[in-house]
Amino acid sequence: MLLKNCETDKQRDIRYACLFKELDVKGNGQVTLDNLISAFEKNDHPLKGNDEAIKMLFTAMDVNKDSVVDLSDFKKYASNAESQIWNGFQRIDLDHDGKIGINEINRYLSDLDNQSICNNELNHELSNEKMNKFSRFFEWAFPKRKANIALRGQASHKKNTDNDRSKKTTDSDLYVTYDQWRDFLLLVPRKQGSRLHTAYSYFYLFNEDVDLSSEGDVTLINDFIRGFGFFIAGGISGVISRTCTAPFDRLKVFLIARTDLSSILLNSKTDLLAKNPNADINKISSPLAKAVKSLYRQGGIKAFYVGNGLNVIKVFPESSIKFGSFEVTKKIMTKLEGCRDTKDLSKFSTYIAGGLAGMAAQFSVYPIDTLKFRVQCAPLDTKLKGNNLLFQTAKDMFREGGLRLFYRGVTVGIVGIFPYAALDLGTFSALKKWYIAKQAKTLNLPQDQVTLSNLVVLPMGAFSGTVGASVVYPINLLRTRLQAQGTYAHPYVYNGFKDVLLKTLEREGYQGLFKGLVPTLAKVCPAVSISYLCYENLKKFMNLE
């Protein structure tokens, strides 16, 4: 059995110094991120060209977080890393002979191969396709392993015939020693608690992803799937979030459309009675309470979910495009700024990316949004329900103004969504980045090893959503009234944005611009929190980050 501590402290220090010298390409005793990238290129390391992996490794090496790694930093990193590597080696080296054969690695990697092999199949013979894939990984990770390949009977090999020469070394002949294992994984970042997992993930992503078709076309299959995954995760998150908060959305639309209801918090009951002399002062209640009673009287609990089916149809592409476009736009901004990773993107560019993503999402689903508001503003005593109400409303809209009516107020909507999405996505990203940096410093860990708990994500989402919704609420209210104009609940008709603004101020004053803000925030806080919570967890589940 191999002993971990077979080398003396002096020998280990000499080895660390030699390794550091290979990374110190400028020979000044300090290694920067650019130096590390150059060293990987110069030494033909398997991860050369993978700036993301090298940056993660550099972050782990930079123990004191001064953006420079010296020999002292490297020794601390290496000592901690080798302890982890040794433990991993022991788990894989089941016969404890101090060597790991390709079959032992195959058994371990089969668990990591996108969970394509179930635990109850591990004892069965692996398919030739998977064996070939793992063998390619073995050769990629340990290109110098041939010094330790057990080539038995070399003398007899020279006497082989031409046919015999075509036979390759068997899998059982391939192995790596602990020293080779350690030297490779020492310069691999650690994700999800395993350096081997990280190495195999990068190999699979950047080497196995390129699939040559019969015509020789190169298609980046997994890269496409990875990018598309952000859209899928965003869409699912939006559907879950919107369904959970549908009643609040119904109340918001009801209050925005009803201009005859005034807040009892901002107005005294005497003032309200002056506007409506026939009202009973003892029965004057808040608009929110009146909305709840009216909706419940209309159809019970189901009344609070009117339009939610349409909401789901709308929110999946909207949320999908918002989150997916945000990730794509951040990558574009990263290239424009010359950053190596989206995590290094400036706050300004992050906010801009969020705003652009919101605009793309809003424009794509605007007709569905308009139809939804029209359905929710139908007469409370209408005999049409469900799909019948939906289809009849759509027919009436098309008959009244054609497709153009479905895009009424789109300019206001696009302009209004930019600051909201920018503040929402940008603030959440900024909070997430700040928290990870703070925790990494407190726990003395690399930032890539800091994970966000669900209890942290929820308040972050609530805060970012509240900030965004509050700032742009007046624009959102005016847009909604433009969309709902001429309906039973909102019979007024406007000539444009300026007209709806002036008439709103004339009828309700400045407080009218914030009517429905309370139920909106009551909806936004949990909605955005749930959305981000689902999105962050789905990204982890789908291995998107």
From Swiss-Prot:
Membrane topology, from the record:
Multi-pass membrane protein
Q: Which residues form the EF-hand domain?
A: 11-46, 80-115, 120-155, 156-191
The protein's location, in the record's own words, is: Mitochondrion inner membrane
Q: Where does Ca(2+) 3 bind?
A: T161, S166
Q: Where does Ca(2+) 2 bind?
A: D93, D95, D97, K99, E104
Mind listing the GO molecular function terms for this protein?
A: calcium ion binding
Q: Name one Pfam family in it.
A: EF-hand_5
Which ranges does the record mark as transmembrane? Answer: 231-248, 307-326, 355-368, 409-428, 458-475, 516-535
Output the Gene Ontology cellular-component terms. Answer: mitochondrial inner membrane
One of this protein's GO BP terms?
Answer: transmembrane transport
Question: Where does the record place its Solcar repeats?
Answer: 225-332, 345-434, 452-541
Positions bound to Ca(2+) 1: K65, D70
The UniProt similarity line reads: Belongs to the mitochondrial carrier (TC 2.A.29) family.
Name of this protein: Calcium-binding mitochondrial carrier SAL1
Q: Which organism is it from?
A: Saccharomyces cerevisiae (Baker's yeast)
Upper classification of the source organism reads: Eukaryota, Fungi, Dikarya, Ascomycota, Saccharomycotina
The gene behind this protein is SAL1
